[in-house]
Amino acid sequence: MSRVAIITGAASGIGRSTAHRLIGQGWSVVGLDVSFGSELATSDKVDGLKTLYCDVTNEGSIVDAFGTIASTYGHVDAIVCSAGKLEIGPLSEMPVEDFDRLYQVNTRGAWLCARQSIPLMRKSPHRDKFPRIVFLGSIAGIRPKVSGGAYGAQKAALHVITSVMAAELGPEGILVNAVAPGTVDTPMVQAKSDSSKTGDYRPSGNSPLGRVAAPEDIAAVIEFLLGEQANYVTGAIIPADGGTRAAFIPPAVQG
Protein backbone atom coordinates (compact mmCIF):
# COMPACT_ATOMS: atom_id res chain seq x y z
CA MET A 1 0.00 0.00 0.00
CA SER A 2 1.43 3.36 -1.03
CA ARG A 3 2.26 6.19 1.34
CA VAL A 4 -0.32 8.98 1.24
CA ALA A 5 0.59 12.63 1.75
CA ILE A 6 -1.59 15.72 1.93
CA ILE A 7 -0.11 19.07 0.93
CA THR A 8 -1.99 22.31 1.52
CA GLY A 9 -1.28 25.27 -0.72
CA ALA A 10 -0.23 22.83 -3.44
CA ALA A 11 -1.15 24.98 -6.44
CA SER A 12 2.14 26.87 -6.49
CA GLY A 13 5.39 27.64 -4.74
CA ILE A 14 6.74 25.37 -2.02
CA GLY A 15 3.61 23.21 -1.93
CA ARG A 16 3.74 22.44 -5.62
CA SER A 17 7.48 21.72 -5.55
CA THR A 18 7.03 19.42 -2.57
CA ALA A 19 4.28 17.53 -4.37
CA HIS A 20 6.54 17.01 -7.36
CA ARG A 21 9.37 15.66 -5.20
CA LEU A 22 7.17 13.29 -3.20
CA ILE A 23 5.47 11.89 -6.27
CA GLY A 24 8.93 11.19 -7.66
CA GLN A 25 9.61 9.16 -4.51
CA GLY A 26 6.50 7.03 -4.99
CA TRP A 27 4.09 8.85 -2.71
CA SER A 28 0.40 9.23 -3.48
CA VAL A 29 -0.14 12.96 -3.04
CA VAL A 30 -3.35 14.92 -2.58
CA GLY A 31 -2.92 18.66 -3.03
CA LEU A 32 -5.38 21.01 -1.36
CA ASP A 33 -5.89 24.58 -2.51
CA VAL A 34 -8.63 27.16 -2.96
CA SER A 35 -7.88 27.20 -6.68
CA PHE A 36 -8.69 23.50 -7.18
CA GLY A 37 -12.06 21.98 -8.06
CA SER A 38 -14.50 20.49 -5.58
CA GLU A 39 -14.04 16.95 -6.91
CA LEU A 40 -10.88 14.89 -6.50
CA ALA A 41 -9.12 15.23 -9.86
CA THR A 42 -5.78 14.68 -11.55
CA SER A 43 -3.61 17.76 -11.95
CA ASP A 44 -2.76 18.89 -15.46
CA LYS A 45 0.38 20.63 -14.16
CA VAL A 46 2.05 18.07 -11.88
CA ASP A 47 2.03 14.46 -13.09
CA GLY A 48 0.46 12.15 -10.54
CA LEU A 49 -0.91 14.87 -8.26
CA LYS A 50 -4.51 14.57 -7.14
CA THR A 51 -6.15 17.93 -6.49
CA LEU A 52 -9.05 18.95 -4.28
CA TYR A 53 -10.60 22.24 -3.22
CA CYS A 54 -9.99 23.31 0.35
CA ASP A 55 -10.22 26.69 2.05
CA VAL A 56 -8.04 26.37 5.16
CA THR A 57 -9.80 29.34 6.77
CA ASN A 58 -13.08 27.40 6.77
CA GLU A 59 -13.33 24.43 9.13
CA GLY A 60 -16.26 22.97 7.20
CA SER A 61 -14.24 23.03 3.98
CA ILE A 62 -11.39 21.22 5.74
CA VAL A 63 -13.73 18.57 7.13
CA ASP A 64 -15.24 18.00 3.68
CA ALA A 65 -11.84 17.68 1.99
CA PHE A 66 -10.51 15.25 4.58
CA GLY A 67 -13.73 13.24 4.35
CA THR A 68 -13.10 12.79 0.63
CA ILE A 69 -9.51 11.75 1.31
CA ALA A 70 -10.65 9.28 4.00
CA SER A 71 -13.18 7.63 1.71
CA THR A 72 -10.65 7.41 -1.14
CA TYR A 73 -7.46 6.34 0.65
CA GLY A 74 -8.51 5.24 4.13
CA HIS A 75 -5.43 6.65 5.81
CA VAL A 76 -2.80 9.38 5.69
CA ASP A 77 0.94 9.04 6.33
CA ALA A 78 1.99 12.69 6.18
CA ILE A 79 0.71 16.22 5.89
CA VAL A 80 2.65 19.28 4.80
CA CYS A 81 0.89 22.47 5.84
CA SER A 82 2.29 24.93 3.32
CA ALA A 83 -0.71 27.15 2.60
CA GLY A 84 0.27 30.67 3.55
CA LYS A 85 -0.44 34.35 3.14
CA LEU A 86 1.88 37.35 3.37
CA GLU A 87 1.08 40.94 4.27
CA ILE A 88 3.76 43.48 5.10
CA GLY A 89 3.57 46.82 6.82
CA PRO A 90 3.88 48.39 10.28
CA LEU A 91 1.93 46.61 13.01
CA SER A 92 0.78 49.98 14.31
CA GLU A 93 -0.95 50.71 11.00
CA MET A 94 -2.04 47.28 9.72
CA PRO A 95 -5.82 46.99 9.28
CA VAL A 96 -7.37 44.52 11.71
CA GLU A 97 -8.92 42.70 8.77
CA ASP A 98 -5.49 42.05 7.25
CA PHE A 99 -4.09 40.78 10.56
CA ASP A 100 -7.06 38.46 11.05
CA ARG A 101 -6.85 37.13 7.50
CA LEU A 102 -3.17 36.30 7.96
CA TYR A 103 -3.90 34.48 11.21
CA GLN A 104 -6.73 32.48 9.66
CA VAL A 105 -4.40 31.09 6.99
CA ASN A 106 -0.95 30.98 8.55
CA THR A 107 -1.73 29.76 12.06
CA ARG A 108 -5.30 28.62 12.57
CA GLY A 109 -5.60 27.00 9.14
CA ALA A 110 -2.36 25.05 9.51
CA TRP A 111 -3.36 23.83 12.96
CA LEU A 112 -6.86 22.82 11.82
CA CYS A 113 -5.50 20.80 8.89
CA ALA A 114 -2.89 19.06 11.02
CA ARG A 115 -5.47 18.25 13.67
CA GLN A 116 -7.90 16.89 11.08
CA SER A 117 -5.20 14.58 9.69
CA ILE A 118 -4.41 12.86 13.00
CA PRO A 119 -7.32 10.35 13.02
CA LEU A 120 -6.33 9.26 9.50
CA MET A 121 -2.69 8.98 10.57
CA ARG A 122 -3.71 6.58 13.32
CA LYS A 123 -5.01 4.28 10.57
CA SER A 124 -1.72 4.27 8.65
CA PRO A 125 -0.38 0.80 7.79
CA HIS A 126 3.13 2.28 7.93
CA ARG A 127 3.18 3.14 11.63
CA ASP A 128 6.72 1.76 12.00
CA LYS A 129 8.06 4.68 9.93
CA PHE A 130 5.26 7.24 9.85
CA PRO A 131 3.19 9.41 10.28
CA ARG A 132 4.71 12.87 9.90
CA ILE A 133 3.43 16.44 10.19
CA VAL A 134 5.47 19.26 8.67
CA PHE A 135 4.52 22.89 9.13
CA LEU A 136 5.87 25.79 7.07
CA GLY A 137 7.17 28.23 9.63
CA SER A 138 9.44 31.15 8.80
CA ILE A 139 12.72 32.70 9.78
CA ALA A 140 10.53 35.76 10.47
CA GLY A 141 9.16 33.82 13.42
CA ILE A 142 12.70 33.45 14.81
CA ARG A 143 14.21 36.83 13.94
CA PRO A 144 11.43 39.43 13.70
CA LYS A 145 11.84 42.34 11.34
CA VAL A 146 10.16 45.66 10.82
CA SER A 147 7.28 45.45 8.32
CA GLY A 148 6.88 41.72 8.89
CA GLY A 149 5.57 41.79 12.44
CA ALA A 150 2.18 40.21 11.85
CA TYR A 151 3.54 37.47 9.61
CA GLY A 152 6.42 36.78 11.98
CA ALA A 153 4.21 36.66 15.07
CA GLN A 154 1.86 34.17 13.48
CA LYS A 155 4.71 31.98 12.27
CA ALA A 156 6.25 32.11 15.75
CA ALA A 157 2.93 30.85 17.08
CA LEU A 158 3.11 28.02 14.56
CA HIS A 159 6.58 27.13 15.86
CA VAL A 160 5.10 26.78 19.35
CA ILE A 161 2.30 24.61 17.96
CA THR A 162 4.97 22.44 16.33
CA SER A 163 6.83 21.92 19.60
CA VAL A 164 3.73 21.18 21.65
CA MET A 165 2.18 18.81 19.11
CA ALA A 166 5.50 16.95 18.87
CA ALA A 167 5.40 16.38 22.63
CA GLU A 168 1.74 15.40 22.60
CA LEU A 169 1.92 13.02 19.64
CA GLY A 170 5.38 11.56 20.16
CA PRO A 171 4.09 8.65 22.27
CA GLU A 172 2.00 7.60 19.26
CA GLY A 173 5.00 7.73 16.93
CA ILE A 174 3.75 10.81 15.07
CA LEU A 175 6.64 13.15 14.29
CA VAL A 176 5.97 16.89 14.09
CA ASN A 177 8.48 19.39 12.69
CA ALA A 178 8.61 22.76 10.95
CA VAL A 179 10.80 24.25 8.26
CA ALA A 180 11.58 27.96 8.70
CA PRO A 181 12.51 29.41 5.29
CA GLY A 182 13.92 32.83 4.65
CA THR A 183 12.84 34.64 1.50
CA VAL A 184 11.65 32.18 -1.16
CA ASP A 185 11.04 32.97 -4.82
CA THR A 186 7.33 32.17 -4.88
CA PRO A 187 4.40 34.00 -6.48
CA MET A 188 3.30 35.17 -3.02
CA VAL A 189 6.67 36.79 -2.28
CA GLN A 190 7.04 38.13 -5.82
CA ALA A 191 3.72 39.94 -5.48
CA LYS A 192 4.85 41.64 -2.29
CA SER A 193 8.27 42.44 -3.74
CA ASP A 194 6.62 44.25 -6.60
CA SER A 195 4.43 46.33 -4.29
CA SER A 196 6.78 46.82 -1.34
CA LYS A 197 9.24 49.65 -0.87
CA THR A 198 10.55 48.38 2.46
CA GLY A 199 13.56 46.57 1.02
CA ASP A 200 12.91 43.53 3.24
CA TYR A 201 11.98 41.32 0.30
CA ARG A 202 14.59 42.32 -2.25
CA PRO A 203 15.96 39.66 -4.65
CA SER A 204 19.04 38.75 -2.59
CA GLY A 205 16.84 38.02 0.41
CA ASN A 206 19.69 39.42 2.55
CA SER A 207 21.41 36.03 2.27
CA PRO A 208 25.22 35.76 2.16
CA LEU A 209 24.62 33.31 -0.68
CA GLY A 210 23.44 36.27 -2.75
CA ARG A 211 20.08 34.82 -3.72
CA VAL A 212 16.72 33.89 -2.30
CA ALA A 213 15.68 30.26 -2.02
CA ALA A 214 13.95 28.48 -4.85
CA PRO A 215 10.84 26.52 -3.82
CA GLU A 216 12.79 23.35 -4.60
CA ASP A 217 15.35 24.26 -1.93
CA ILE A 218 12.68 24.20 0.76
CA ALA A 219 10.93 21.16 -0.72
CA ALA A 220 14.19 19.24 -0.33
CA VAL A 221 14.23 19.94 3.41
CA ILE A 222 10.61 18.84 3.68
CA GLU A 223 11.44 15.65 1.79
CA PHE A 224 14.20 14.95 4.31
CA LEU A 225 11.77 15.35 7.22
CA LEU A 226 9.43 12.85 5.57
CA GLY A 227 12.20 10.34 4.92
CA GLU A 228 13.69 7.50 6.94
CA GLN A 229 16.79 9.52 7.78
CA ALA A 230 14.61 11.78 9.95
CA ASN A 231 13.10 8.96 12.03
CA TYR A 232 14.42 10.50 15.27
CA VAL A 233 13.67 14.13 14.43
CA THR A 234 10.62 15.67 16.07
CA GLY A 235 9.84 19.04 17.61
CA ALA A 236 12.49 20.67 15.42
CA ILE A 237 12.25 24.11 13.81
CA ILE A 238 14.76 23.88 10.96
CA PRO A 239 15.97 27.21 9.50
CA ALA A 240 16.42 27.10 5.73
CA ASP A 241 17.33 30.73 5.15
CA GLY A 242 20.62 30.61 3.26
CA GLY A 243 22.48 32.04 6.23
CA THR A 244 20.33 35.15 6.53
CA ARG A 245 20.02 34.88 10.29
CA ALA A 246 23.70 34.06 10.76
CA ALA A 247 24.77 37.12 8.75
CA PHE A 248 22.32 39.53 10.37
CA ILE A 249 23.87 42.68 11.81
CA PRO A 250 21.47 44.84 13.84
CA PRO A 251 21.06 48.30 12.28
CA ALA A 252 22.21 49.91 15.53
CA VAL A 253 25.69 48.40 15.19
CA GLN A 254 26.10 48.70 11.44
CA GLY A 255 28.51 51.25 10.17
How should each PLM-predicted stretch be described?
Residues 90-91, 98-103, 203:
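Substrate-binding pocket helix/loop in short-chain dehydrogenase/reductase
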Residues 119, 167-171, 231:
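Alpha-helical segment proximal to the catalytic Tyr-Lys
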Residues 80, 170, 175, 233-235:
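Short, small/polar-rich loop/turn modules that mediate ligand/substrate recognition or access, typified
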Residues 138:
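Residue(s) in the substrate-gating loop at a strand-loop-helix junction
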Residues 114, 154:
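Active-site helix of classical SDR
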Residues 223, 234-255:
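Short C-terminal tail/terminal secondary-structure segment
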Residues 92, 143-149, 171, 210, ...:
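Active-site loop immediately N-terminal to the catalytic Tyr-X3-Lys motif
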